[in-house]
């Protein structure tokens, strides 16, 4: 037998045969023929490209189509072979009729190998007629094999051997660029597109290119908004079948992925992969700059984002105000400030939020659920942050400490409070009023101060119409109408409508005089009394009688004089 040629692995159809095939069968023929040709090119056997291959590459009908019918009926099958026929009868018939039509001349009746036989030599049942079959194979220069693992038909040695590689997992095709190996040449060809960035499938809508047609098809759904995969349970739709499959687990509550280490179960394979790293403490994504490591598979993105902390890079810029961010999600959230968009709405009360996390926290108000419980005392909370704060009561932990060693703060929010506290020592007042130049050490103080210039009093009493420039003043005022006195003295039972009034009253019982004059040492139980007393030393008499011009250092003395 001569050397292998393209003719040996070519199967030709008549025009009638070709039009009898459906689209799937025609595509199967194209794929097989093109792959055979690529294999010959890879082995250095094929020199020139036949017209048939050119037509197939261009998606046209095969150019070398025979104009006459070669054979009308398939070979006759042995009785013992018929018992082992696979359910894919149509595909087998297709190959028997078209690919094996030349065997009709053969004296040996059985040209189909018994299921489980890998070659002609192993088929013991048909061994009696082997000489006739062998003669036929030499004449037609073609062989047919059936793999015992999958129902597939192969012609020539190259196809059969190539198929066996898939089962043995032998990877003979290696990428010179990155060293990755593949079983099939076609797989290597597809892989090479990653390196050469061959993006032959381009989106007409946005110009984005892909190296696979299936990827382009999925991408197009982004523009059309098409979601063909719908959940029968709740009606939710998805643009990928895999996403629907993952979603269905929510309804079945199935958790098929179980950790062998601790027995914990998960509904996604990716979740168990992440979980396993807890046991082996694996953190594969590490940053060389600060040695910080990340353990989740998604941390490759997190690592990229983390690097921006060191580089200071902020590639995502707001077109509205110019503010830049180091994460695209942060920019998306920021844009809602300009648009006023609040897409996350509570179904219970209609309140809307610009973040899904805020809506989740809000919903707990309606359910009154308190899922975060203190193991120490049993107290429950509706937020994890509240539980974290509460735990510090038991540990007496004060994580945020002033460097001056004067005060410590135990709340997580105290990081801001600590920053504000430090200003007391530095005397810094970074918040300045543009109207009068007065400076403050807190932004909230400046906001309250500005109301003096504007005269604005946004907090109005619904009872009497009186307005205030601070909400706290309105709250205190409302007590006048209700007559409520919530602050009660434990010593004598006297009640007050302000906590500050109760604090002043308590000094009567203790006899304490905490406010001392630095000039003469005289103590007072109220700060206001000390302020008035200091005027004696300063010689200041701010309270003047208009009739006679006499001045007093205390308003009460002026009142007495007037009477």
Swiss-Prot record:
GO CC, one annotated term: nucleus
Coiled-coil stretches noted in the UniProt entry, renumbered to this chain: none
Show the CDD domains listed in the entry.
Answer: KRAB_A-box
UniProt keyword annotations, A-Z? DNA-binding, Metal-binding, Nucleus, Repeat, Transcription, Transcription regulation, Zinc, Zinc-finger
**GO biological process, alphabetically ordered:** regulation of DNA-templated transcription
Keyword hit for Metal-binding: yes
Q: List the disulfide bonds.
A: none
Where is this protein found?
Answer: Nucleus
All copies of domain KRAB, residue ranges: 4-75
Q: Which GO terms describe its molecular function?
A: DNA-binding transcription factor activity, RNA polymerase II-specific; RNA polymerase II cis-regulatory region sequence-specific DNA binding; zinc ion binding
- Write out the similarity annotation: Belongs to the krueppel C2H2-type zinc-finger protein family.
Which protein, by its recorded name, is this? Zinc finger protein 257
What species is this protein from? Homo sapiens (Human)
Lineage, uppermost ranks: Eukaryota, Metazoa, Chordata, Craniata, Vertebrata
| Gene encoding the protein | ZNF257
């Amino acid at each position: 037998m001569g050397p292998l040629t393209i003719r040996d692995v070519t199967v030709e159809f008549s025009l009638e045969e070709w039009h009898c095939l459906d689209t799937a069968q025609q595509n199967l023929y194209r794929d097989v023929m093109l792959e055979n040709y690529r294999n010959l090119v890879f082995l250095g056997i094929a020199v020139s490209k036949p017209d048939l291959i050119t037509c197939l590459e261009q998606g046209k009908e095969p150019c070398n189509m025979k104009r006459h019918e070669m054979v009308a009926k398939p070979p006759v099958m042995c009785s013992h072979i018929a018992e082992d026929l696979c359910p894919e009868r149509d595909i087998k018939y297709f190959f028997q009729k078209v690919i094996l039509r030349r065997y009709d001349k053969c004296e040996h009746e059985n040209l189909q190998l018994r299921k489980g036989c890998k070659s002609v030599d192993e088929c013991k049942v048909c061994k009696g007629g082997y000489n006739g079959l062998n003669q036929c194979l030499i004449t037609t220069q073609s062989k047919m094999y059936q793999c015992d693992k999958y129902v597939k038909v192969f012609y020539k040695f190259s196809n059969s051997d190539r198929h066996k590689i898939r089962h043995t997992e032998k990877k003979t095709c290696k990428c010179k660029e990155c060293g990755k190996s593949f079983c099939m040449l076609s797989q290597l060809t597809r892989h090479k597109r990653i390196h050469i960035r061959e993006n032959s499938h381009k989106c007409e809508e946005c110009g984005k290119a892909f190296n696979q047609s299936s990827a382009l098809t999925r991408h197009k759904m982004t523009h059309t908004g098409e979601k063909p995969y719908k959940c029968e349970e709740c009606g939710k739709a998805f643009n990928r079948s895999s996403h629907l499959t993952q979603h269905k687990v929510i309804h079945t509550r199935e958790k098929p992925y179980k950790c062998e280490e601790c027995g914990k179960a998960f509904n996604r394979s990716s979740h168990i992969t992440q979980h396993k790293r807890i046991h082996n403490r694996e953190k594969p994504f590490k940053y060389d700059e600060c040695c910080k490591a990340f353990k989740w598979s998604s941390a490759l993105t997190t690592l990229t984002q983390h690097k921006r902390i060191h580089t200071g890079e902020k590639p995502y810029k707001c077109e509205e105000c110019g503010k830049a961010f180091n994460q695209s999600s942060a920019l998306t959230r920021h844009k809602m400030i300009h648009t006023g968009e609040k897409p996350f709405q509570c179904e219970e009360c209609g309140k809307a939020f610009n973040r899904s996390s805020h809506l989740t926290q809000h919903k707990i108000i309606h359910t009154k659920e308190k899922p975060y419980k203190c193991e120490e005392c049993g107290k429950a909370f509706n937020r994890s942050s509240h539980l974290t704060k509460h735990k510090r009561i038991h540990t007496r932990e004060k994580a945020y400490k002033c460097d001056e060693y004067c005060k410590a703060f135990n709340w997580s929010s105290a990081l801001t409070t600590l920053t504000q506290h430090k200003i007391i020592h530095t005397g810094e007042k970074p918040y300045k009023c543009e109207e009068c130049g007065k400076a403050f050490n807190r932004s909230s103080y400046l906001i309250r101060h500005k109301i003096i210039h504007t005269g604005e009093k946004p907090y109005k009493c619904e009872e009497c119409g009186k307005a205030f420039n601070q909400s706290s003043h309105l709250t205190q005022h409302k007590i006048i109408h209700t007559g409520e006195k919530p602050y009660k003295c434990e010593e004598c039972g006297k009640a007050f409508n302000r906590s500050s009034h109760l604090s002043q009253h308590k000094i009567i019982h203790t006899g304490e005089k905490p406010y001392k004059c630095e000039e003469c040492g005289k103590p007072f139980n109220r700060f206001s009394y000390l302020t008035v007393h200091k005027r004696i030393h300063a010689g200041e008499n701010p309270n003047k009688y208009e009739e006679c011009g006499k001045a007093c250092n205390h308003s009460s003395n002026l009142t007495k004089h007037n009477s």
